[in-house]
């Protein structure tokens, strides 16, 4: 019996791969850190219209997520980019850096 091959067609949702990558990054990061409750992952588009996934961890866990010579961070970025099925930047911040960044952001109004 011969199996029918399905064409590898992209989903009708262009962000489906990026959302899957965001969920996967959250899962992996929570397994790596000592403070999994503080892990936050956000997906947004930067000013150059490039998708960005931002991983925010407790300051004590930053070294675990980056790894020796950045090996863990490189592996996480590789997995996320493969899952996203497209270009995506992965930024890794500690929660203190993220809080400072949001204070520096311009407010509307």
Give the ranges of each region predicted by the language model.
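RNA-contacting regions in translation and RNA-metabolism proteins
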Residues: 1-62, 74-75, 79-109
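Glycine-centered tight-turn and secondary-structure capping sites
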Residues: 66-70
């Amino acid at each position: 019996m011969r199996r029918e091959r399905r064409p590898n067609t992209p989903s009708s949702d262009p962000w489906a791969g990026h959302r899957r990558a965001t969920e996967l990054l959250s899962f992996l990061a929570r397994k790596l850190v000592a403070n999994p409750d503080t892990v936050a992952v956000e997906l947004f588009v930067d000013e150059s219209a490039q998708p960005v996934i931002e991983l925010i961890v407790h300051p004590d866990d930053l070294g675990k997520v980056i790894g020796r010579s950045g090996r863990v961070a490189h592996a996480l970025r590789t997995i996320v980019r493969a899952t996203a099925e497209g270009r995506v930047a992965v930024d890794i911040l500690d929660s203190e850096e993220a809080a400072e960044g949001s204070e520096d952001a311009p407010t509307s109004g």
